[in-house]
């Protein structure tokens, strides 16, 4: 069936429609609103986004905060050039970290960030990740100090399709105004559209709940299996506080700000009587595993053959997704992380 064929999720996007910078002010970004019942499409901007939110819906937001996850160092302590890139993925046990390191590397190699700080490669893992430990001279760094190191020396982890180095504006624009709990290596991009003023109005006028899904490096990986149902999606750390869990259980209508919030809600709602607050979320939503517990979605325009495009198709159908993306391209909407948005009602 074509809805399970990976090639069905391919499309052509002119390079000039890939957004390399955000629209400022945020309210001026374009917004495509699609109402499923009437099939109506409205073209507007984000200054009007809350006018379209159903009044009785619970709005769910992901308050993860992006780390400065890209570090550059040298394999030799005395070399001034920092050409070895370390992409921090997540903490592992005993203050070690899972990373991706560009170039040839072997266990025992060291990467120097300055005269004091370095990392040592502990193990090369089968999935391309590298297990490393960070040190200040010979003293291992704990998680708190590793985060300080990232903040001091790291760069914002812009997606690979943004063909430029990070700049000072990315430190705040590639971060939502409600980002709170650090741990993501990519921004939940629908959240980037909210200015402080729009957020305050949302929190005042709508029932809402916060959760934290730390977006992982796997979000940039495309689906590679010919049959999308065979794809194994990456695992991400999810935290839903008890207060938010109670609100989610009580709510009939749910509007999610972004696919990360939607995946989190779907994962949580499918659990049987869990008393936990922290989870390992690995839910892959597509037409064979459709959305059951979320009614509305605010999202960006996603990459061809990506799991996020399949999620959108699970909500509105493959053909309708293709139709709307074709319209968005014709109307010169800007795509991907710094691009424009789409509200599905």
UniProtKB/Swiss-Prot annotation:
It catalyses: 7-aminomethyl-7-carbaguanosine(34) in tRNA + S-adenosyl-L-methionine = epoxyqueuosine(34) in tRNA + adenine + L-methionine + 2 H(+). Keywords: Cytoplasm, Queuosine biosynthesis, S-adenosyl-L-methionine, Transferase. Pathway: tRNA modification; tRNA-queuosine biosynthesis. InterPro entries: QueA, QueA_dom1, QueA_dom2, QueA_sf. Signal peptide: none annotated. Its EC number is 2.4.99.17. One of its GO terms (biological process) is tRNA wobble guanine modification. Gene3D superfamilies: QueA-like (3.40.1780.10). It is found in: Cytoplasm. GO terms for molecular function: S-adenosylmethionine:tRNA ribosyltransferase-isomerase activity. Transmembrane segments: none annotated. One of its GO terms (cellular component) is cytoplasm. Belongs to the QueA family. Monomer. Transfers and isomerizes the ribose moiety from AdoMet to the 7-aminomethyl group of 7-deazaguanine (preQ1-tRNA) to give epoxyqueuosine (oQ-tRNA). This is S-adenosylmethionine:tRNA ribosyltransferase-isomerase. It comes from Helicobacter pylori (strain HPAG1). The lineage of its organism: Bacteria, Pseudomonadati, Campylobacterota, Epsilonproteobacteria, Campylobacterales.
């Amino acid at each position: 069936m074509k809805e399970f064929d990976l090639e069905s999720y391919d499309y052509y996007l002119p390079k000039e429609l890939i957004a390399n910078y955000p629209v400022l002010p945020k309210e001026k970004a374009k917004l495509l609103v699609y109402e499923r019942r009437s099939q109506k499409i409205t073209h507007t901007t984000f200054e009007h986004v809350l006018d379209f939110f159903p009044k009785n819906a619970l709005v769910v937001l992901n308050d993860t905060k992006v780390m400065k996850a890209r570090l550059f160092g040298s394999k030799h302590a005395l070399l001034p050039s920092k050409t070895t890139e370390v992409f921090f993925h997540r903490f592992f046990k005993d203050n070690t970290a899972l990373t991706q390191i560009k170039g040839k590397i072997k266990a025992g190699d060291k990467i120097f960030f300055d005269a004091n700080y370095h990392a040592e490669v502990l193990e090369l893992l089968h999935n391309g990740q590298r297990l490393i430990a960070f040190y200040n001279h010979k003293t291992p760094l704990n998680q708190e100090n590793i985060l300080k190191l990232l903040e001091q020396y790291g760069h914002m982890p812009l997606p690979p399709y943004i063909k430029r180095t990070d700049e000072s504006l990315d430190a705040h624009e590639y971060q939502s105004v409600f980002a709170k709990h650090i741990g993501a290596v990519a921004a939940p991009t629908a959240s980037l559209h909210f200015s402080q003023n729009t957020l305050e109005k949302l929190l005042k006028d709508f029932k809402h709940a916060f959760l934290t899904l730390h977006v992982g490096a796997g979000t940039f990986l495309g689906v590679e299996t010919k049959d999308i149902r065979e794809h194994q999606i990456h695992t991400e750390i999810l935290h839903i506080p008890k207060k938010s869990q109670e609100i989610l259980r009580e709510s009939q209508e749910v509007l999610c700000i972004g696919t990360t919030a939607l995946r989190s809600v779907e994962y949580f709602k499918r659990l049987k009587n869990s008393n936990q607050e922290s989870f390992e979320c690995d839910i892959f939503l597509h037409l064979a595993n459709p959305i059951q517990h979320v009614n509305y979605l605010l999202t960006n325009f996603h990459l061809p053959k990506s799991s996020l495009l399949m999620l959108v198709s699970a909500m509105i159908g493959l053909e309708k997704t293709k139709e709307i993306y074709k319209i968005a391209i014709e109307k010169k909407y800007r795509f991907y992380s710094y691009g424009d948005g789409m509200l599905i009602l």
